[in-house]
Amino acid sequence: MSTEPELHRNDSSPSRNPEDRRKRRRPEDYVEAISQHSTRAKEHFLHPGTHYRPLAQFLKGSLHKSLRIRTVSQPRPHIFAALHNLDCSFDDPNRVRFFDSKEGLDDFASYPLPRKNCGQLLFLRGYPSPKWVQLIGAKYRVDAEFFRRHLSIGQISEPFDISVLPSASQNIVKLSITSLGKQNVTLSKQGEGVDSLKDFHESLGDDPNVVGDSIVRRYSVHDKTRFSIEQDVTMCVLKTGESWIAIILLDCGRDLDEGPAGPWIESSSRPHMHGFDNVFNPVLLFEPNICLKSFEKKEGTSSSNGTQLLQKRCFQQSCSLLHTKSYGRFLSPAVMNTDAFYALSDVFNFAACAESQFLGLLKSKFMSETHLHNKEEHMKECLLDLKDHKLLLHEHIQGIQAVISIINDRGGSRWPRAGSASDAARMVSMTPSARRSSKESMLQVVVERPAITEQEMLPARSGAEAEAEAMAQRLLKDYEALRSDAQALSDLYSEGMRDIRDNAMLAESRKAIEQARGVGHLTLLAYFFLPLSFTSTLFGMNFKELGDDVSIWAC
Protein backbone atom coordinates (compact mmCIF):
# COMPACT_ATOMS: atom_id res chain seq x y z
CA MET A 1 0.00 0.00 0.00
CA SER A 2 1.30 3.45 -0.95
CA THR A 3 2.29 5.73 1.90
CA GLU A 4 2.00 8.92 -0.15
CA PRO A 5 -1.37 10.11 1.28
CA GLU A 6 -0.08 9.68 4.83
CA LEU A 7 3.10 11.61 4.05
CA HIS A 8 1.11 14.37 2.40
CA ARG A 9 -1.22 14.61 5.37
CA ASN A 10 1.67 14.78 7.82
CA ASP A 11 3.39 17.51 5.79
CA SER A 12 0.36 19.72 5.36
CA SER A 13 -1.66 19.26 8.55
CA PRO A 14 -1.31 22.17 10.99
CA SER A 15 0.11 21.52 14.40
CA ARG A 16 -2.13 22.05 17.41
CA ASN A 17 0.80 22.85 19.67
CA PRO A 18 0.97 26.63 20.36
CA GLU A 19 4.74 26.40 20.70
CA ASP A 20 4.97 24.98 17.16
CA ARG A 21 2.82 27.82 15.87
CA ARG A 22 5.15 30.39 17.41
CA LYS A 23 8.13 28.66 15.85
CA ARG A 24 6.43 28.62 12.46
CA ARG A 25 6.18 32.40 12.65
CA ARG A 26 9.96 32.70 12.56
CA PRO A 27 11.35 33.91 9.22
CA GLU A 28 13.56 30.86 8.82
CA ASP A 29 10.58 28.54 9.29
CA TYR A 30 8.60 30.50 6.70
CA VAL A 31 11.42 29.99 4.20
CA GLU A 32 11.73 26.32 5.09
CA ALA A 33 8.00 25.73 4.54
CA ILE A 34 8.20 27.24 1.05
CA SER A 35 11.39 25.36 0.29
CA GLN A 36 9.88 22.03 1.32
CA HIS A 37 6.80 22.59 -0.82
CA SER A 38 8.98 23.51 -3.80
CA THR A 39 10.55 20.02 -3.70
CA ARG A 40 7.23 18.26 -4.29
CA ALA A 41 7.43 16.88 -7.81
CA LYS A 42 4.56 16.01 -10.13
CA GLU A 43 5.51 12.32 -10.02
CA HIS A 44 4.49 11.99 -6.36
CA PHE A 45 2.09 14.83 -5.50
CA LEU A 46 -1.21 15.95 -6.96
CA HIS A 47 -0.32 19.51 -5.92
CA PRO A 48 3.30 19.90 -7.04
CA GLY A 49 5.33 22.86 -5.87
CA THR A 50 8.06 23.08 -8.48
CA HIS A 51 6.85 26.53 -9.54
CA TYR A 52 7.87 27.79 -6.10
CA ARG A 53 11.53 26.84 -6.58
CA PRO A 54 12.62 30.27 -7.90
CA LEU A 55 10.88 31.97 -4.95
CA ALA A 56 12.55 29.57 -2.51
CA GLN A 57 15.92 30.31 -4.11
CA PHE A 58 15.21 34.03 -3.88
CA LEU A 59 14.37 33.78 -0.17
CA LYS A 60 17.54 31.77 0.46
CA GLY A 61 19.60 34.24 -1.54
CA SER A 62 20.79 31.54 -3.93
CA LEU A 63 19.51 33.10 -7.17
CA HIS A 64 22.51 33.82 -9.36
CA LYS A 65 22.76 37.55 -9.96
CA SER A 66 25.66 39.21 -11.73
CA LEU A 67 26.41 42.67 -10.35
CA ARG A 68 25.83 45.27 -13.05
CA ILE A 69 26.51 48.96 -13.40
CA ARG A 70 24.00 51.11 -11.53
CA THR A 71 23.02 54.64 -12.48
CA VAL A 72 24.31 56.07 -9.18
CA SER A 73 27.04 54.82 -6.88
CA GLN A 74 25.45 55.99 -3.61
CA PRO A 75 21.63 55.64 -3.55
CA ARG A 76 19.65 58.01 -1.37
CA PRO A 77 18.11 56.90 1.96
CA HIS A 78 14.91 55.05 1.21
CA ILE A 79 11.71 54.46 3.18
CA PHE A 80 10.87 50.87 2.26
CA ALA A 81 7.92 50.21 4.61
CA ALA A 82 5.17 52.51 5.86
CA LEU A 83 2.63 51.26 8.40
CA HIS A 84 -0.66 53.16 8.80
CA ASN A 85 -2.53 52.59 12.08
CA LEU A 86 -6.14 53.22 11.14
CA ASP A 87 -7.34 53.51 14.76
CA CYS A 88 -5.42 56.79 15.09
CA SER A 89 -6.51 60.16 13.76
CA PHE A 90 -4.68 61.85 10.91
CA ASP A 91 -3.11 64.35 13.31
CA ASP A 92 -1.84 61.63 15.63
CA PRO A 93 1.94 61.18 15.21
CA ASN A 94 1.48 57.43 15.76
CA ARG A 95 -0.82 57.03 12.77
CA VAL A 96 2.02 56.38 10.30
CA ARG A 97 5.36 54.73 11.07
CA PHE A 98 8.15 54.71 8.50
CA PHE A 99 10.85 52.04 8.32
CA ASP A 100 14.14 52.56 6.52
CA SER A 101 15.29 49.92 4.05
CA LYS A 102 18.44 49.20 6.10
CA GLU A 103 17.97 49.98 9.80
CA GLY A 104 14.19 49.58 9.81
CA LEU A 105 14.11 45.78 9.60
CA ASP A 106 14.66 45.19 13.33
CA ASP A 107 12.25 47.97 14.30
CA PHE A 108 9.56 46.48 12.09
CA ALA A 109 10.11 43.01 13.57
CA SER A 110 9.35 44.33 17.05
CA TYR A 111 6.42 46.52 16.02
CA PRO A 112 3.14 45.15 17.45
CA LEU A 113 0.27 43.70 15.46
CA PRO A 114 -2.91 45.79 15.08
CA ARG A 115 -5.03 46.16 18.18
CA LYS A 116 -8.38 44.43 18.57
CA ASN A 117 -11.03 45.65 16.09
CA CYS A 118 -8.43 47.82 14.35
CA GLY A 119 -6.88 47.80 10.91
CA GLN A 120 -3.48 48.58 9.46
CA LEU A 121 -2.15 49.38 6.00
CA LEU A 122 1.37 48.23 5.20
CA PHE A 123 2.99 49.80 2.13
CA LEU A 124 6.15 48.14 0.79
CA ARG A 125 7.96 50.22 -1.82
CA GLY A 126 10.02 48.69 -4.59
CA TYR A 127 11.88 45.42 -5.05
CA PRO A 128 12.15 43.75 -1.64
CA SER A 129 15.10 41.95 -0.15
CA PRO A 130 14.79 38.29 0.94
CA LYS A 131 14.99 39.32 4.61
CA TRP A 132 12.04 41.70 4.31
CA VAL A 133 9.91 39.06 2.56
CA GLN A 134 10.87 36.45 5.17
CA LEU A 135 9.97 38.73 8.07
CA ILE A 136 6.65 39.97 6.67
CA GLY A 137 5.62 36.52 5.46
CA ALA A 138 6.30 34.95 8.84
CA LYS A 139 4.85 37.78 10.95
CA TYR A 140 1.52 37.93 9.13
CA ARG A 141 1.45 34.38 7.70
CA VAL A 142 1.25 35.67 4.14
CA ASP A 143 0.41 33.22 1.38
CA ALA A 144 3.61 32.60 -0.60
CA GLU A 145 1.59 32.90 -3.82
CA PHE A 146 1.12 36.59 -3.02
CA PHE A 147 4.86 37.26 -3.15
CA ARG A 148 5.43 34.86 -6.04
CA ARG A 149 2.97 36.69 -8.28
CA HIS A 150 4.28 40.12 -7.44
CA LEU A 151 7.86 39.02 -8.08
CA SER A 152 6.93 37.29 -11.36
CA ILE A 153 9.74 38.98 -13.28
CA GLY A 154 13.18 37.92 -14.36
CA GLN A 155 14.13 34.57 -12.87
CA ILE A 156 11.28 34.30 -10.34
CA SER A 157 8.65 32.70 -12.60
CA GLU A 158 7.78 31.35 -16.01
CA PRO A 159 5.19 33.13 -18.18
CA PHE A 160 2.77 30.19 -18.02
CA ASP A 161 2.68 29.40 -14.29
CA ILE A 162 0.49 32.34 -13.20
CA SER A 163 -3.10 31.12 -13.00
CA VAL A 164 -5.79 33.36 -14.49
CA LEU A 165 -8.64 31.56 -12.70
CA PRO A 166 -10.64 33.87 -10.40
CA SER A 167 -10.65 31.23 -7.68
CA ALA A 168 -6.85 31.34 -7.62
CA SER A 169 -6.84 35.09 -6.95
CA GLN A 170 -9.49 35.46 -4.24
CA ASN A 171 -7.24 37.50 -1.96
CA ILE A 172 -4.68 38.77 -4.48
CA VAL A 173 -5.66 42.09 -6.05
CA LYS A 174 -3.43 43.53 -8.75
CA LEU A 175 -3.71 47.02 -10.25
CA SER A 176 -1.62 48.55 -12.99
CA ILE A 177 -0.42 52.16 -12.79
CA THR A 178 0.79 53.87 -15.96
CA SER A 179 3.21 56.79 -15.71
CA LEU A 180 3.70 59.10 -18.69
CA GLY A 181 7.20 60.32 -19.43
CA LYS A 182 8.72 62.88 -21.75
CA GLN A 183 12.24 62.67 -23.08
CA ASN A 184 14.11 62.53 -26.36
CA VAL A 185 13.65 58.86 -27.23
CA THR A 186 16.68 57.66 -29.18
CA LEU A 187 15.68 54.03 -29.55
CA SER A 188 15.19 53.26 -33.21
CA LYS A 189 12.89 50.32 -32.64
CA GLN A 190 10.47 49.21 -29.97
CA GLY A 191 12.33 45.89 -29.86
CA GLU A 192 15.42 47.60 -28.46
CA GLY A 193 13.37 48.83 -25.51
CA VAL A 194 12.08 45.30 -24.89
CA ASP A 195 15.61 43.89 -24.80
CA SER A 196 16.78 46.68 -22.51
CA LEU A 197 13.82 46.08 -20.17
CA LYS A 198 14.71 42.38 -19.99
CA ASP A 199 18.24 43.28 -18.92
CA PHE A 200 16.74 45.64 -16.33
CA HIS A 201 14.63 42.81 -14.88
CA GLU A 202 17.67 40.56 -14.64
CA SER A 203 19.51 43.30 -12.73
CA LEU A 204 16.88 43.76 -10.00
CA GLY A 205 18.20 42.60 -6.65
CA ASP A 206 21.77 42.26 -7.89
CA ASP A 207 23.08 44.38 -5.02
CA PRO A 208 22.02 42.89 -1.64
CA ASN A 209 22.84 46.18 0.08
CA VAL A 210 20.25 48.13 -1.93
CA VAL A 211 16.57 47.51 -1.17
CA GLY A 212 13.60 49.12 -2.89
CA ASP A 213 14.60 49.55 -6.53
CA SER A 214 11.57 50.46 -8.64
CA ILE A 215 10.12 47.71 -10.83
CA VAL A 216 8.90 48.46 -14.36
CA ARG A 217 6.68 45.85 -16.01
CA ARG A 218 6.32 47.45 -19.45
CA TYR A 219 8.03 50.22 -21.39
CA SER A 220 6.25 51.71 -24.42
CA VAL A 221 7.45 54.36 -26.86
CA HIS A 222 4.61 56.46 -28.28
CA ASP A 223 6.59 58.95 -30.36
CA LYS A 224 9.95 60.71 -30.38
CA THR A 225 9.27 62.66 -27.19
CA ARG A 226 6.79 60.57 -25.18
CA PHE A 227 6.90 57.17 -23.54
CA SER A 228 5.10 55.36 -20.73
CA ILE A 229 5.94 52.77 -18.11
CA GLU A 230 3.59 50.38 -16.34
CA GLN A 231 4.00 49.35 -12.72
CA ASP A 232 1.89 47.04 -10.57
CA VAL A 233 0.31 47.36 -7.15
CA THR A 234 -0.41 43.99 -5.53
CA MET A 235 -2.63 43.88 -2.45
CA CYS A 236 -4.01 41.34 -0.01
CA VAL A 237 -5.95 41.61 3.25
CA LEU A 238 -5.17 39.32 6.18
CA LYS A 239 -7.02 38.89 9.44
CA THR A 240 -5.05 38.61 12.67
CA GLY A 241 -7.53 37.58 15.33
CA GLU A 242 -10.21 40.31 15.48
CA SER A 243 -8.04 42.82 13.65
CA TRP A 244 -6.82 43.00 10.06
CA ILE A 245 -3.96 44.28 7.95
CA ALA A 246 -3.74 45.11 4.24
CA ILE A 247 -0.37 44.58 2.59
CA ILE A 248 0.27 46.78 -0.45
CA LEU A 249 3.28 45.92 -2.61
CA LEU A 250 4.23 48.91 -4.76
CA ASP A 251 6.47 48.59 -7.80
CA CYS A 252 7.32 52.25 -7.36
CA GLY A 253 10.22 52.52 -4.93
CA ARG A 254 13.44 54.41 -5.47
CA ASP A 255 13.61 56.86 -8.33
CA LEU A 256 14.45 55.12 -11.59
CA ASP A 257 17.71 57.03 -11.98
CA GLU A 258 18.98 55.31 -8.81
CA GLY A 259 18.41 51.73 -9.94
CA PRO A 260 19.69 49.52 -12.75
CA ALA A 261 19.93 51.03 -16.21
CA GLY A 262 16.74 50.89 -18.26
CA PRO A 263 15.47 52.08 -21.65
CA TRP A 264 14.04 55.27 -20.11
CA ILE A 265 17.53 56.67 -19.63
CA GLU A 266 20.46 56.47 -22.03
CA SER A 267 24.01 55.87 -20.83
CA SER A 268 25.29 59.07 -22.41
CA SER A 269 22.78 61.24 -20.54
CA ARG A 270 23.25 59.86 -17.01
CA PRO A 271 25.96 62.33 -15.95
CA HIS A 272 23.72 65.23 -17.03
CA MET A 273 20.50 64.15 -15.33
CA HIS A 274 20.44 67.19 -13.03
CA GLY A 275 19.97 69.40 -16.08
CA PHE A 276 16.66 67.75 -17.05
CA ASP A 277 13.23 68.88 -16.01
CA ASN A 278 10.85 66.37 -14.46
CA VAL A 279 10.78 63.31 -16.69
CA PHE A 280 7.39 61.98 -15.53
CA ASN A 281 4.12 63.84 -15.69
CA PRO A 282 2.17 64.13 -12.43
CA VAL A 283 -0.95 62.03 -11.90
CA LEU A 284 -3.79 64.51 -11.43
CA LEU A 285 -6.27 63.48 -8.71
CA PHE A 286 -9.70 65.08 -8.45
CA GLU A 287 -11.27 66.03 -5.15
CA PRO A 288 -14.18 68.49 -4.76
CA ASN A 289 -13.09 71.80 -3.25
CA ILE A 290 -9.50 70.58 -3.10
CA CYS A 291 -8.16 74.15 -3.06
CA LEU A 292 -10.09 74.95 0.11
CA LYS A 293 -9.54 71.61 1.82
CA SER A 294 -5.79 71.71 1.33
CA PHE A 295 -5.61 74.79 3.57
CA GLU A 296 -7.59 73.06 6.29
CA LYS A 297 -5.61 69.81 6.16
CA LYS A 298 -1.95 70.60 5.73
CA GLU A 299 -0.06 67.58 4.50
CA GLY A 300 3.13 68.26 6.42
CA THR A 301 6.76 68.75 5.53
CA SER A 302 8.90 66.32 3.63
CA SER A 303 10.50 64.84 6.75
CA SER A 304 7.20 64.23 8.52
CA ASN A 305 5.61 62.90 5.36
CA GLY A 306 8.14 60.17 4.69
CA THR A 307 9.75 61.76 1.64
CA GLN A 308 13.12 63.23 0.85
CA LEU A 309 12.99 66.58 -0.95
CA LEU A 310 16.58 67.67 -0.31
CA GLN A 311 17.35 68.09 -4.00
CA LYS A 312 15.63 68.19 -7.34
CA ARG A 313 14.58 64.69 -8.38
CA CYS A 314 14.09 64.47 -12.12
CA PHE A 315 12.70 60.92 -12.08
CA GLN A 316 10.30 61.22 -9.15
CA GLN A 317 6.82 59.78 -9.81
CA SER A 318 3.50 60.70 -8.26
CA CYS A 319 2.99 57.12 -7.04
CA SER A 320 6.10 57.51 -4.87
CA LEU A 321 3.87 59.46 -2.43
CA LEU A 322 1.14 56.84 -1.98
CA HIS A 323 2.68 55.62 1.28
CA THR A 324 2.87 59.03 2.96
CA LYS A 325 0.63 60.65 5.56
CA SER A 326 -1.33 62.24 2.73
CA TYR A 327 -2.91 58.87 1.96
CA GLY A 328 -6.60 58.78 2.89
CA ARG A 329 -6.73 62.46 3.88
CA PHE A 330 -10.20 62.89 2.38
CA LEU A 331 -11.61 59.57 3.61
CA SER A 332 -13.51 58.85 6.80
CA PRO A 333 -11.11 57.47 9.46
CA ALA A 334 -13.87 55.39 11.04
CA VAL A 335 -14.87 53.71 7.78
CA MET A 336 -11.22 53.10 6.89
CA ASN A 337 -10.82 51.28 10.20
CA THR A 338 -13.73 48.91 9.54
CA ASP A 339 -13.89 48.49 5.75
CA ALA A 340 -10.77 47.21 3.99
CA PHE A 341 -11.95 48.04 0.47
CA TYR A 342 -12.81 51.59 1.51
CA ALA A 343 -9.40 51.94 3.15
CA LEU A 344 -7.74 50.93 -0.14
CA SER A 345 -10.02 53.06 -2.31
CA ASP A 346 -7.38 55.77 -2.72
CA VAL A 347 -5.14 53.22 -4.47
CA PHE A 348 -7.96 52.33 -6.87
CA ASN A 349 -8.67 56.02 -7.45
CA PHE A 350 -5.02 56.78 -8.15
CA ALA A 351 -4.79 53.94 -10.69
CA ALA A 352 -7.98 55.17 -12.38
CA CYS A 353 -6.67 58.74 -12.72
CA ALA A 354 -3.38 57.47 -14.15
CA GLU A 355 -5.27 55.29 -16.64
CA SER A 356 -7.44 58.24 -17.69
CA GLN A 357 -4.35 60.31 -18.50
CA PHE A 358 -2.87 57.42 -20.47
CA LEU A 359 -6.00 57.07 -22.58
CA GLY A 360 -6.02 60.83 -23.10
CA LEU A 361 -2.45 60.67 -24.42
CA LEU A 362 -3.30 57.92 -26.89
CA LYS A 363 -6.40 59.74 -28.09
CA SER A 364 -4.56 63.02 -28.65
CA LYS A 365 -1.78 61.16 -30.45
CA PHE A 366 -4.30 59.48 -32.75
CA MET A 367 -6.08 62.73 -33.56
CA SER A 368 -2.86 64.61 -34.24
CA GLU A 369 -1.57 61.95 -36.64
CA THR A 370 -4.76 61.24 -38.58
CA HIS A 371 -3.60 63.38 -41.51
CA LEU A 372 -0.60 61.07 -41.97
CA HIS A 373 -2.89 58.13 -42.80
CA ASN A 374 -3.38 59.47 -46.34
CA LYS A 375 0.30 60.00 -47.07
CA GLU A 376 1.81 57.03 -48.82
CA GLU A 377 5.29 57.51 -47.36
CA HIS A 378 3.88 57.25 -43.79
CA MET A 379 1.31 54.48 -44.30
CA LYS A 380 3.50 51.55 -43.31
CA GLU A 381 4.86 53.30 -40.23
CA CYS A 382 1.38 54.45 -39.14
CA LEU A 383 -0.10 50.98 -39.65
CA LEU A 384 2.55 49.34 -37.46
CA ASP A 385 2.12 52.05 -34.82
CA LEU A 386 -1.67 51.62 -34.74
CA LYS A 387 -1.31 47.86 -34.53
CA ASP A 388 1.07 48.06 -31.54
CA HIS A 389 -1.13 50.57 -29.70
CA LYS A 390 -4.28 48.57 -30.36
CA LEU A 391 -2.65 45.52 -28.78
CA LEU A 392 -1.60 47.69 -25.84
CA LEU A 393 -5.17 49.00 -25.51
CA HIS A 394 -6.54 45.46 -25.58
CA GLU A 395 -4.41 44.52 -22.57
CA HIS A 396 -5.49 47.68 -20.75
CA ILE A 397 -9.15 46.88 -21.42
CA GLN A 398 -8.65 43.43 -19.93
CA GLY A 399 -7.01 44.98 -16.88
CA ILE A 400 -9.86 47.47 -16.43
CA GLN A 401 -12.40 44.66 -16.69
CA ALA A 402 -10.54 42.72 -14.00
CA VAL A 403 -10.63 45.75 -11.69
CA ILE A 404 -14.39 46.10 -12.26
CA SER A 405 -14.83 42.51 -11.09
CA ILE A 406 -12.75 43.30 -8.00
CA ILE A 407 -14.89 46.34 -7.20
CA ASN A 408 -18.08 44.32 -7.60
CA ASP A 409 -16.69 41.81 -5.09
CA ARG A 410 -15.53 44.64 -2.79
CA GLY A 411 -12.02 43.20 -2.97
CA GLY A 412 -12.80 39.77 -1.61
CA SER A 413 -15.44 37.85 0.28
CA ARG A 414 -13.26 37.69 3.40
CA TRP A 415 -12.30 41.33 3.47
CA PRO A 416 -13.61 43.23 6.52
CA ARG A 417 -16.62 45.35 5.65
CA ALA A 418 -18.42 48.19 7.34
CA GLY A 419 -21.40 46.91 9.30
CA SER A 420 -19.86 43.54 10.11
CA ALA A 421 -18.74 44.86 13.51
CA SER A 422 -20.76 47.14 15.79
CA ASP A 423 -20.06 50.86 15.75
CA ALA A 424 -19.59 50.79 19.52
CA ALA A 425 -16.75 48.27 19.30
CA ARG A 426 -15.12 50.30 16.56
CA MET A 427 -15.40 53.59 18.46
CA VAL A 428 -14.02 52.04 21.65
CA SER A 429 -10.98 50.71 19.81
CA MET A 430 -10.14 54.10 18.29
CA THR A 431 -8.19 56.83 20.04
CA PRO A 432 -10.17 59.82 21.43
CA SER A 433 -8.96 62.18 18.69
CA ALA A 434 -9.83 59.64 16.01
CA ARG A 435 -13.22 59.15 17.66
CA ARG A 436 -13.99 62.87 17.38
CA SER A 437 -12.79 62.90 13.78
CA SER A 438 -14.98 59.88 13.11
CA LYS A 439 -18.10 61.57 14.48
CA GLU A 440 -17.47 64.71 12.43
CA SER A 441 -16.86 62.66 9.30
CA MET A 442 -19.98 60.55 9.74
CA LEU A 443 -22.03 63.70 10.46
CA GLN A 444 -20.78 65.16 7.20
CA VAL A 445 -21.85 61.98 5.39
CA VAL A 446 -25.36 62.26 6.82
CA VAL A 447 -25.68 65.96 5.96
CA GLU A 448 -24.35 65.67 2.40
CA ARG A 449 -26.25 62.49 1.54
CA PRO A 450 -29.43 63.25 -0.49
CA ALA A 451 -32.84 61.98 0.52
CA ILE A 452 -33.18 58.25 0.04
CA THR A 453 -36.17 56.28 -1.09
CA GLU A 454 -37.80 53.39 0.71
CA GLN A 455 -36.15 50.97 -1.70
CA GLU A 456 -32.73 52.32 -0.72
CA MET A 457 -33.59 51.93 2.94
CA LEU A 458 -34.13 48.17 2.51
CA PRO A 459 -32.01 46.85 4.02
CA ALA A 460 -31.21 49.73 6.32
CA ARG A 461 -27.55 50.61 6.38
CA SER A 462 -25.42 52.37 8.92
CA GLY A 463 -23.58 55.55 8.04
CA ALA A 464 -20.33 53.61 7.60
CA GLU A 465 -21.97 51.13 5.24
CA ALA A 466 -23.49 53.95 3.22
CA GLU A 467 -20.15 55.73 2.93
CA ALA A 468 -18.34 52.55 1.90
CA GLU A 469 -21.03 51.68 -0.64
CA ALA A 470 -20.97 55.20 -2.09
CA MET A 471 -17.22 54.97 -2.58
CA ALA A 472 -17.53 51.58 -4.27
CA GLN A 473 -20.21 52.91 -6.63
CA ARG A 474 -18.06 55.93 -7.44
CA LEU A 475 -15.09 53.74 -8.34
CA LEU A 476 -17.32 51.40 -10.31
CA LYS A 477 -18.65 54.27 -12.44
CA ASP A 478 -15.12 55.57 -13.01
CA TYR A 479 -13.78 52.22 -14.17
CA GLU A 480 -16.81 51.54 -16.34
CA ALA A 481 -16.22 54.92 -17.99
CA LEU A 482 -12.56 54.00 -18.49
CA ARG A 483 -13.58 50.72 -20.09
CA SER A 484 -15.98 52.54 -22.41
CA ASP A 485 -13.36 55.14 -23.37
CA ALA A 486 -10.70 52.49 -23.95
CA GLN A 487 -13.05 50.42 -26.11
CA ALA A 488 -14.06 53.50 -28.13
CA LEU A 489 -10.40 54.37 -28.63
CA SER A 490 -9.67 50.80 -29.69
CA ASP A 491 -12.45 51.09 -32.27
CA LEU A 492 -10.86 54.33 -33.51
CA TYR A 493 -7.57 52.53 -33.94
CA SER A 494 -9.31 49.73 -35.84
CA GLU A 495 -11.01 52.29 -38.09
CA GLY A 496 -7.69 54.02 -38.65
CA MET A 497 -6.08 50.73 -39.63
CA ARG A 498 -8.92 50.07 -42.10
CA ASP A 499 -8.52 53.57 -43.56
CA ILE A 500 -4.80 53.04 -44.05
CA ARG A 501 -5.40 49.69 -45.74
CA ASP A 502 -8.09 51.23 -47.97
CA ASN A 503 -5.81 54.13 -48.85
CA ALA A 504 -2.99 51.71 -49.58
CA MET A 505 -5.25 49.66 -51.86
CA LEU A 506 -6.41 52.86 -53.58
CA ALA A 507 -2.81 53.93 -54.07
CA GLU A 508 -1.99 50.53 -55.55
CA SER A 509 -5.01 50.84 -57.84
CA ARG A 510 -3.78 54.23 -59.03
CA LYS A 511 -0.38 52.76 -59.69
CA ALA A 512 -1.99 49.90 -61.64
CA ILE A 513 -4.01 52.38 -63.72
CA GLU A 514 -0.90 54.41 -64.47
CA GLN A 515 0.93 51.24 -65.42
CA ALA A 516 -1.99 50.24 -67.66
CA ARG A 517 -1.84 53.61 -69.37
CA GLY A 518 1.85 53.15 -69.96
CA VAL A 519 1.23 49.70 -71.40
CA GLY A 520 -1.41 51.22 -73.72
CA HIS A 521 1.07 53.71 -75.04
CA LEU A 522 3.57 50.95 -75.62
CA THR A 523 0.91 48.90 -77.42
CA LEU A 524 0.12 51.83 -79.73
CA LEU A 525 3.77 52.29 -80.52
CA ALA A 526 4.13 48.58 -81.11
CA TYR A 527 1.15 48.69 -83.53
CA PHE A 528 3.09 50.97 -85.85
CA PHE A 529 6.58 49.89 -84.99
CA LEU A 530 6.25 46.15 -85.55
CA PRO A 531 5.07 46.28 -89.24
CA LEU A 532 7.65 48.93 -89.97
CA SER A 533 10.30 46.86 -88.31
CA PHE A 534 9.23 43.80 -90.26
CA THR A 535 9.33 45.68 -93.55
CA SER A 536 12.72 47.18 -92.86
CA THR A 537 14.00 43.82 -91.82
CA LEU A 538 12.63 42.18 -94.93
CA PHE A 539 14.19 44.66 -97.30
CA GLY A 540 17.37 44.62 -95.37
CA MET A 541 17.90 40.93 -96.17
CA ASN A 542 20.53 39.82 -98.76
CA PHE A 543 18.84 38.67 -102.05
CA LYS A 544 20.43 37.11 -105.13
CA GLU A 545 20.94 39.72 -107.85
CA LEU A 546 18.32 39.60 -110.63
CA GLY A 547 18.58 40.43 -114.24
CA ASP A 548 17.34 43.64 -115.79
CA ASP A 549 14.33 42.02 -117.40
CA VAL A 550 13.17 39.97 -114.36
CA SER A 551 10.94 41.44 -111.69
CA ILE A 552 10.86 40.45 -108.04
CA TRP A 553 7.44 38.85 -108.45
CA ALA A 554 8.89 36.45 -110.89
CA CYS A 555 11.19 35.10 -108.28
Language model regions located:
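Alpha-helical transmembrane anchor segments
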Residues: L525-C555
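Extended N-terminal soluble domains of membrane/secretory-pathway proteins
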Residues: S2-H378, D385-L392
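Hydrophobic alpha-helical segments
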Residues: R148, S157, A504, G540, ...
